[in-house]
Curated annotation (Swiss-Prot):
One of its GO terms (cellular component) is cytoplasm. GO terms for biological process: intracellular iron ion homeostasis; iron-sulfur cluster assembly. Residues 168-181 have a biased composition (Low complexity). Component of the core Fe-S cluster (ISC) assembly machinery. Pathway: Cofactor biosynthesis; iron-sulfur cluster biosynthesis. Its cofactor is [2Fe-2S] cluster. Belongs to the NifU family. The keyword Lipid metabolism does not apply. This is Iron sulfur cluster assembly protein 1, mitochondrial. NCBIfam families: iscU. Scaffold protein for the de novo synthesis of iron-sulfur (Fe-S) clusters within mitochondria, which is required for maturation of both mitochondrial and cytoplasmic [2Fe-2S] and [4Fe-4S] proteins. First, a [2Fe-2S] cluster is transiently assembled on the scaffold protein ISU1. In a second step, the cluster is released from ISU1, transferred to a glutaredoxin, followed by the formation of mitochondrial [2Fe-2S] proteins, the synthesis of [4Fe-4S] clusters and their target-specific insertion into the recipient apoproteins. It comes from the Eukaryota. The keyword Iron-sulfur applies. It comes from Yarrowia lipolytica (strain CLIB 122 / E 150) (Yeast).
Length: 181
């Protein structure tokens, strides 16, 4: 009799384990969609665009590294800018939730081909609206906005370091030409 109870008990435990395992298994796209993620988030999460990195020491590359202490998301976004101030290439690496990855992926598509001034005006509300992010995930779109602004700032600081007196030289050039004439 005791043996039967143990067997039954073990049988119940064995049946309970797969349910527990299924709950703890990695999330499939179907499981994610049940949680209410918009199809655009799922698309950018499952097929992220422009993942990678560039050499941060290149003078035409700006790097933005931002994080959200509340949730642990970290986003690195890099831009490559041509001589006309237009973003030619964009790469990102994000460690975080699906919404953070989707926000990063989307913003890389958004800024490519834009001038630095245009890219600097991008607001998180545009990103959040496009991806239909719920209020609890708005910080992900804020990270993307902060990352692009940080990358632009890094690029601009490299340009100033490379040519610290560019403005002064440009101002002196006409005067020097007049003085020698």
């Amino acid at each position: 009799m005791m043996f039967n109870r143990i067997t039954r008990s073990a049988g119940l435990l064995a049946r309970a384990r797969p349910t527990t395992t299924a709950v703890m298994s990695p999330m499939t796209p179907l499981a994610i969609s049940r949680r209410g993620y918009h199809e655009k988030v799922l698309d950018h999460y499952n097929n992220p665009r422009n993942v990678g990195s560039m050499n941060k020491n290149d003078e035409d590359v700006g790097t933005g590294l931002v994080g959200a202490p509340a949730c642990g998301d970290v986003m690195k976004l890099q831009i490559r800018v041509d001589d006309n101030g237009v973003i030619q290439d964009v790469k990102f690496k994000t460690f975080g939730c699906g919404s953070a990855i989707a926000s990063s992926s989307y913003v890389t598509e958004l800024v490519r081909g834009k001038s630095l001034a245009e890219a600097g005006k991008i607001k998180n509300t545009v990103i959040a609206k496009e991806l239909s992010l719920p209020p609890v995930k708005l910080h992900c779109s804020m990270l993307a906005e902060d990352a692009i602004k940080s990358a632009i700032s890094d690029y601009n600081s490299k340009r100033k370091t490379k040519n610290p007196t560019l403005g002064a030289e440009a101002a002196e050039t006409p005067a020097a030409a007049t003085a020698t004439a």
